[in-house]
């Protein structure tokens, strides 16, 4: 019976192999001897070992499988042995067919002396898991590193899957079916998955992409199920009126120390952590609400914007709800972790769009003597007729050329690191190079975020709301809070300026000049034909950042010619059922305000409190976005107490609940961790700009007269990644 079971399994797999073809070529015959071997001599002797293991053959045919499928069944007990020169074949099922790549290993050609170490090699990744704080060293000396994840039998989603689902009225969540972190333990101990699964080995779906946001409070809907706040019961002013009266202002107050990179890095980070699925805006053609799909913002008689008045409303599509979930919840398409999702995407099914085949590099395009993100050159014949969009891990890379510039910088940084790793380790596979470079880039982003950006944003609140790192906590869930992504971290829209300058090497305006904000939206041609990313980055670093407490007319009156970003933020909060400002004050340990003057502890300006009283019925009606933006900033920071609380709480969980946070022992070797601590945004700019010679040591500070040569900015020593 067992032999029959195995034969039926074999027949089933042969049927699959016959059905799926790649580029009109059938797959090569299975390898049946030493298909995959570790350096300790343990092998899977058949190409289908993992398939048989996935359907229970390790138990059903224990004797045969124990001997012949040692890796798939986890039955290897062999002692350490020399590296075997074997042919390895990696196969995976990606939903559209089997993808197979074969590489030939010629074995070691030189004798390498391993330096003395207190660690001794182990024979399995389960043993490494028992010494997790030394995982990186153990995996290396035991030669257990596997840069390819086994996804066979696991459900995966892609951006295309979500896009195809939206017209049905709802979107699916990523299922936990087939998610077994033990199956690819040697991969999971060293590298992140693209979709964030198995970061927490015991709770593998925490922080994963294509899952619902968390909440600090239950969703606040008019009907308790999904109707937006103030849609059935007119309890609040329209989002447009609230923004126009309370937040929109042509007055710009700038910071005396921080530069515009604070604004741009914040947007870059927000796209790393979350992306909400929206209903198609084409569904919203009138000023009448469409159930579950459209929630237009009416324009009042007193509104001075004649363009808005002529259209009578601002058309707003709702976020797509998750299927079969009530009350209504929204989907996060990105992972919750600081992992470079905006660079690499959040699904293995999408990676081919960004990665250069099976090499260690990201795809780039050489255009006008600069390496940029891939784009369709047929749509960019000249600067006056350029409608091309860059391809990146997050489609929003094209929203603003400042954001595009950071995307380009980090794609170049990945490839710079990948090139160096290839030179240091010529025997590494493309998969190994790619995963190591991706891991390093993610760690650099974390270092810049927690050591450079957040202390400036949060000022004296940083130590209280985030504090020093005390290690990975398996009980901390990094999943993004709806209150954070929908309201709190949209504070950065208040930092957007009317005009941005572009600066040359000498500190002068470039020939093409600066640009108004609206002229930098979806304008890739300005990068491709007007000097590249350098002048944009220099302009950001030499211009004081606008304090975020008011919103410039560039985004409240002129955004894309027909909408108001501030009103959109308020409306999105109501769409998602975000609790009121008063409720979030309580979450942050402040007293509940019974009168509008009770807000005086955080909103010192009595005129602002009076404005709230004129526009809102009660203190419990004030939108979180509006109230928090009006708060006076904390000492040394850019945001007020409630925002610093909501933002800090999320970033603390994103750090402490991330097994791959770079300071967590075992993720990198000790020497590698010390190198990552040397990284900085200034160094990344110096290494990847087309022509940068002088830079502020801290990329977020105005340079004054203290510019530093790039040669004196500390840099990582990538030789610490040379394999033994």
Curated annotation (Swiss-Prot):
Q: Which UniProt keywords apply?
A: Calcium, Developmental protein, Disulfide bond, Glycoprotein, Heme, Iron, Metal-binding, Oxidoreductase, Peroxidase, Signal
List, alphabetically, the GO terms of the cellular component aspect: extracellular space
**Broad EC category:** oxidoreductase
ShKT domain spans which residues? 42-76
Phenotype reported upon loss of the gene:
Gross morphological abnormalities causing larval arrest with associated molt defects and low levels of embryonic lethality. Cuticle function and integrity are also impaired.
Does Heme count among this protein's keywords?
Answer: yes
| Reactions listed under catalytic activity | 2 a phenolic donor + H2O2 = 2 a phenolic radical donor + 2 H2O
Q: What are the EC numbers?
A: 1.11.1.7
Q: Which residues form the signal peptide?
A: 1-24
Q: Which CDD domains match?
A: peroxinectin_like
Annotated family: Belongs to the peroxidase family.
State the name under which the record lists this protein.
Peroxidase mlt-7
The primary gene name is mlt-7
């Amino acid at each position: 019976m067992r032999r029959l079971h195995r034969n039926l399994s074999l027949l089933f797999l042969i049927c699959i192999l016959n059905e799926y073809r790649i580029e009109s070529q059938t797959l090569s015959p299975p390898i049946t001897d030493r298909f995959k071997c570790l350096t300790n001599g343990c092998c899977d002797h058949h190409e289908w070992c993992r398939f048989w293991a996935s359907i229970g053959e390790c138990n059903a045919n224990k004797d045969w499988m124990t001997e012949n499928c040692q890796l798939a069944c986890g039955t290897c007990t062999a002692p350490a042995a020399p590296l075997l020169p074997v042919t390895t074949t990696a196969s995976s099922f990606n939903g559209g067919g089997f993808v197979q790549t074969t590489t030939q290993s010629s074995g070691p050609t030189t004798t390498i002396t391993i330096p003395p170490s207190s660690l001794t090699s182990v024979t399995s990744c389960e043993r490494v898991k028992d010494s997790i704080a030394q995982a990186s060293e153990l995996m290396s000396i035991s030669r257990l590193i596997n840069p390819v994840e086994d996804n066979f039998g696991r459900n995966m989603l892609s951006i295309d899957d979500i896009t195809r689902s939206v017209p049905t009225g709802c979107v699916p969540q990523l299922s936990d079916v087939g998610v077994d972190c033990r199956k690819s333990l040697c991969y999971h101990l060293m590298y992140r998955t693209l979709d964030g699964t198995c970061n927490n080995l015991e709770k593998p779906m925490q922080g994963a992409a294509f899952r619902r946001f968390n909440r600090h409070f239950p969703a606040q809907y008019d009907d308790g199920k999904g109707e937006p706040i103030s849609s059935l019961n007119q309890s609040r002013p329209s989002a447009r009126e609230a923004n126009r009266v309370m937040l929109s202002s042509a007055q710009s107050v700038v910071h005396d120390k921080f530069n515009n990179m604070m604004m741009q890095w914040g947007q870059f980070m927000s796209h790393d952590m979350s992306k909400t699925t929206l209903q198609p805006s084409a569904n919203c053609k009138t000023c009448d609400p469409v159930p579950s799909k459209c929630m237009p913002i009416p324009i009042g008689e007193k509104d001075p914007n004649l363009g808005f008045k002529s259209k009578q409303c601002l058309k707003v599509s709702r976020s797509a709800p998750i299927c079969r979930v009530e009350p209504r919840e929204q989907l996060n398409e990105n992972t919750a972790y600081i992992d470079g999702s905006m660079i690499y995407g959040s699904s293995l099914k999408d990676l081919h769009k960004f990665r250069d085949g099976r090499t260690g590099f990201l795809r780039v395009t050489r255009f006008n003597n600069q390496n940029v993100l891939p784009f369709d050159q047929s749509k960019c014949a000249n600067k006056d007729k350029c409608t091309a969009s860059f391809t990146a891990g997050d489609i929003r890379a094209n929203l603003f050329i400042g954001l595009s510039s950071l995307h380009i910088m980090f794609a170049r940084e990945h490839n710079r690191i990948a090139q160096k790793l290839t030179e240091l380790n010529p025997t590494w596979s493309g998969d190994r190079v790619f995963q190591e470079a991706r891991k390093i880039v993610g760690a650099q982003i974390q270092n810049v975020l927690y050591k450079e950006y957040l202390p400036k944003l949060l000022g004296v609140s940083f130590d209280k709301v985030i504090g020093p790192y005390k290690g990975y906590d398996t009980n901390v869930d990094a999943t993004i809070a709806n209150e954070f992504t929908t309201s709190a971290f949209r504070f950065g829209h208040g930092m957007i300026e009317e005009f941005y300058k572009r600066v040359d090497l000498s500190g002068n305006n470039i020939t093409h000049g600066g640009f108004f904000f609206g002229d930098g939206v979806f304008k890739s041609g300005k990068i491709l034909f007007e000097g590249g990313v350098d002048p944009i980055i220099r302009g950001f670093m030499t211009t004081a950042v606008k304090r975020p407490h008011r919103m410039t007319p560039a985004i409240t009156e002129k955004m894309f010619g027909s909408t108001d970003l501030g009103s959109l933020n308020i409306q999105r909060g109501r769409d998602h059922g975000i609790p009121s400002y008063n409720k979030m004050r309580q979450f942050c340990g402040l007293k509940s305000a019974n009168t509008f003057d009770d807000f005086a502890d955080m909103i010192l300006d009595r005129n602002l409190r009076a404005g709230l009283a004129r526009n809102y019925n009660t203190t419990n009606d004030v939108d979180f976005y509006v109230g928090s933006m009006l708060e006076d900033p904390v000492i040394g920071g850019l945001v007020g107490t409630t925002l610093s609380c909501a933002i800090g709480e999320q970033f603390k969980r994103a750090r402490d609940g991330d097994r791959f946070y770079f300071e967590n022992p075992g993720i990198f070797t000790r020497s590698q961790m010390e190198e990552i601590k040397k990284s900085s945004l200034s160094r990344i700019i110096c290494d990847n700009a087309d022509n940068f010679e002088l830079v502020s040591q801290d990329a977020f500070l105005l340079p004054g007269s203290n510019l530093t040569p790039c040669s004196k900015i500390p840099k990582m020593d990538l030789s610490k990644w040379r394999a033994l």
